[in-house]
Curated annotation (Swiss-Prot):
Membrane topology listed for this record: Single-pass type II membrane protein
Subcellular compartments: Membrane
Organism field: Arabidopsis thaliana (Mouse-ear cress)
InterPro entries associated with the record: FucosylTrfase_pln, GDP-Fuc_O-FucTrfase
Glycan attachment points: N109, N153, N405, N465
Lineage: Eukaryota, Viridiplantae, Streptophyta, Embryophyta, Tracheophyta
UniProt name for this protein: Protein ROOT HAIR SPECIFIC 17
Name of the gene encoding the protein in the UniProt record: RHS17
A GO term from the CC aspect: membrane
Pathway: Glycan metabolism
GO MF, any single term: glycosyltransferase activity
TM spans (from-to): 39-59
PANTHER family, per the entry: O-FUCOSYLTRANSFERASE 16, PROTEIN ROOT HAIR SPECIFIC 17
GO aspect biological process, one term: fucose metabolic process
């Protein structure tokens, strides 16, 4: 009974409290009216009213919600300024592999209609080739030289590498590539020799016929322009040989291109060994890693005609370098960037990768030469991906010494690491990017990220006007079709070296599983340049062994 009375008394306390509050407010208002002519009492009255109002709200308002975890839930603010998340990402399986790759396999075998060397050999025709450009540009020349020799029914002399261009690398073919493998592996396709016979050398010592064929020269172009001279002189040299063969050839010639590129052209044992050492050291750091081919060297930026905010110093330095190319016209940097033809900056590449879902914890291998701006240019990328590595950070000076003074050999090491990475990304569409894109398609459609620079330009430019969620959503949408998935490119689209459609066949999943039994997937095995088939299982040089592999 006593408790019941107490409860009633408590219930009646609330109305009494309200009456007291109202009476207090009324009293203060009366004081205000009586003393309105005095400033100090006015301030006191207003202050008193405010205090009483605040007190009344605090006593009458309901109590705050209590959460089970004793923390107040905070809803994300959609107007939050652009801020890259400190941690996290969706480093899931989709980022590291193609879900459709099992439906395709490499198929570069010659068919029964392909004429082998023994049935079409001409012993009095010798083709000399002088390649041009950097290592991967020269690689395209080597590949097409074999096909040109086949078209002309000529004996190919091992191509000479470019030792006079910007890079000034004195390496010969045999210093970078396994020349004996190159000759023997293609013996059924084209006859290749290391040097001209002595009698031919003496004949051309004073009168070597050298010529340059047009770019994208077709088979009929070679037969019309080169064959008559070759028949007459017996020896012809084709100079500046890069992209001098048509992109559109018949299927047999395209398959020959693939046999050269993906099977016959492989690096020397010393380069392969060092390249594999770099890969192994990356694998010790993480199960998966991304390789970035960063073309941000001064010559690349000068050639592009783009501007990166370095003021008058940048304009003078790159402008002077650009004048070395006599055929280049004055560039409109903003127009070039708007059209997606500017190499992405290290920061932009980092933002794109984070937007795609690669977390801050991902290990990143950077394949690059001298970066314009040095460490200051790389700092934003390093902030986005602190686990950043190069061949210099992964090795000692002693280990790298045999390669350090040769730009082509250093580029070959980067090529191997990029080729064997789980995901490959590039900031431009240069020769190495194209060669690797095609190779990774041929060897199993491994994740290969090519920036959709024309679309990305707008979101990079306006990123501070959007949230991170909006930014990453747009990055993923714009990069659809630029991730190395099968069927992203139609047959014949782009350079053949980046889209070897004639050498990639579709198969059923059942056939894939059946043939996959014969593939050794142990990463610790010794692999050749052909892909995932251990060297020990390929002692024979017959082409038929290679197309039975599903990559």
């Amino acid at each position: 009974m006593a408790s019941l009375k107490l409860k009633k008394r408590d219930n009646g306390a609330e109305p009494d409290k309200k009456k007291l509050v109202i009476a207090g407010i009324r009293h203060q208002l009366l004081l205000l009216l009586r003393r309105r002519h005095r400033l100090f009492p006015l301030v006191s009255a207003v202050s008193g009213c405010l205090l009483l109002i605040l007190f009344s709200f605090s006593t009458l308002s309901p109590p705050p919600l209590i959460h089970h975890n004793n923390q107040v839930a905070v809803e994300p603010n959609p107007t939050t300024p652009f801020r890259v998340p400190e941690n996290g990402g969706r480093s899931d399986r989709q980022l590291w592999s193609s879900r459709l790759s099992n439906l395709y396999y490499a198929c570069s075998n010659a068919t029964d209609t392909f004429q082998v060397t023994d049935t079409r050999s001409q012993t009095n025709r010798y083709l000399l080739i002088a390649t041009s450009g950097g290592l991967n540009q020269q690689r395209t020349g080597i590949i097409d030289a074999v096909v040109a020799a086949y078209i002309l029914n000529a004996t190919l002399v091992v191509p000479k590498l470019d030792q006079k261009s910007y890079w000034k690398d004195t390496s010969n073919f045999e210093d970078i590539f396994d020349v004996d493998w190159f000759i023997s592996h293609l013996s059924k396709d084209v006859k290749i020799i290391k040097e001209l016979p002595k009698e031919e050398q003496s004949r051309i010592s004073t009168s070597l016929q050298s010529m340059r064929v047009p770019r994208k020269c077709t088979p009929s172009c070679y037969l019309q322009r080169v064959l008559p001279i070759l028949t007459k002189k017996h020896v012809v040299q084709l100079s500046k040989f890069d992209y001098r063969l048509s992109n559109a050839l018949d299927t047999e010639l395209q398959k020959l291109r693939c046999r050269v590129n993906y099977h016959a052209v492989r690096y020397t044992e010393s380069i392969n060994r060092m390249g594999q050492l770099l890969v192994d050291r990356m694998r010790k750091k993480a199960k998966h890693f991304v390789a970035l081919h960063l073309r941000f060297e001064p010559d690349m930026l000068a050639f592009s005609g783009c501007y990166y905010g370095g003021g008058q110093k940048e304009r003078l330095e790159l402008g002077a370098m650009r004048r070395r190319w006599k055929t280049l016209h004055a560039a409109n940097p903003e127009k070039v960037r708007r059209h997606g033809r500017c190499p992405l900056t290290p920061e932009e590449i980092g933002l794109m990768l984070r937007g795609l879902g690669f977390g801050k914890e991902v290990h990143l291998y950077v394949a690059s030469g001298e970066v314009y701006g040095g460490e200051d240019t790389l700092a934003p990328l390093r902030a986005l991906f602190p686990n950043l590595h190069t061949k210099e950070t992964l090795t000692s000076k002693k280990e790298l010494a045999p390669f350090a003074n040769f730009s082509s050999r250093m580029a070959a090491l980067d090529f191997i690491v990029c080729d064997k990475s789980d995901a490959f990304v590039t900031n431009n569409n240069g020769n190495m990017a194209r060669i690797l894109a095609g190779r990774r398609r041929y060897l199993g459609h491994k994740v290969t990220i090519r920036p959709n620079a024309k679309k990305l330009y707008e979101i990079f430019k306006n990123r501070h006007n959007m949230t991170w969620g909006e930014f990453s959503s747009k990055v993923r949408r714009y990069q659809t079709g630029f991730m190395g998935e099968p069927d992203e490119m139609k047959p014949g689209e782009g350079e053949f070296h980046e889209n070897p459609a004639s050498c990639i066949c579709r198969t059923s999943e059942a056939r894939v599983k059946e043939k996959a039994k014969h593939v050794n997937e142990d990463d610790s095995s010794e692999y050749s340049e052909i892909g995932n088939v251990p060297i020990s299982s390929r002692s024979d040089l017959d082409h038929s062994q290679f197309d039975e592999v599903i990559f």
